[in-house]
A protein has these predicted regions:
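Short N-terminal micro-motifs specific to bacterial/archaeal maturation
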Residues: 10-13, 46, 67, 120
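Divalent metal-coordination and catalytic microenvironments
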Residues: 55
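Generic structural signal for short, flexible, solvent-exposed coil/loop and linker residues
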Residues: 20-21, 29, 37, 65, ...
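Non-catalytic interface/linker regions that flank or bridge core catalytic/transmembrane domains
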Residues: 1-34
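Residue-level recognition of alpha-helical structural elements
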Residues: 3, 18, 44, 71-74
Length: 136
């Protein structure tokens, strides 16, 4: 199963009104192919989607362990899967030269650069994710 398919399967556990519109909107973005960061977790094609899945799995595990039946699975999945929507359409890819194992050899590799286009007045990463959820 691809990362995108895993994400869609997990999102099927969300029953809130608007989830179908949210999933349709994600299809029009780079969410499934974007990185999660430029150098740290998920700094690769598809890293944003993969990171969101990992966060969802961990949150469900933690909730089951520390707060069983205290939060709805619906709420936990919503928070975890969509916590980084602010990163949609914020990365560009350009080549970067990296030293090869062979002395004097360099290899071009993709490098992600963070270039947010519009924060719509949001002052934080979290508030922009919330804005994007409300705007769909």
């Amino acid at each position: 199963m691809t990362t995108k398919e895993q994400f869609i399967e997990m999102a099927k556990g969300i029953t809130r009104p608007g989830i179908d519109q949210m999933m349709a909107w994600l299809e029009t973005t780079d969410f499934y192919t974007a990185p999660a960061s430029t150098r740290f977790h998920g700094a690769e094609e598809g890293g944003l989607c993969a990171h969101s899945i990992t966060v969802a799995k961990r949150l469900l595990e933690i909730a089951d362990l520390w707060a069983p039946n205290q939060y709805s699975r619906d709420a936990l999945l919503t928070v975890a899967l969509f916590h980084d929507l602010c990163k949609i359409s914020t990365y560009t890819v350009s080549p970067r030269n990296v030293k090869d194992d062979t002395p004097g050899q360099w290899t071009k590799v993709p490098f992600y650069k963070f270039e947010p286009k519009d924060s719509v007045g949001c002052d934080s990463h979290g508030s922009l994710s919330c804005y994007r959820i409300m705007a769909t």
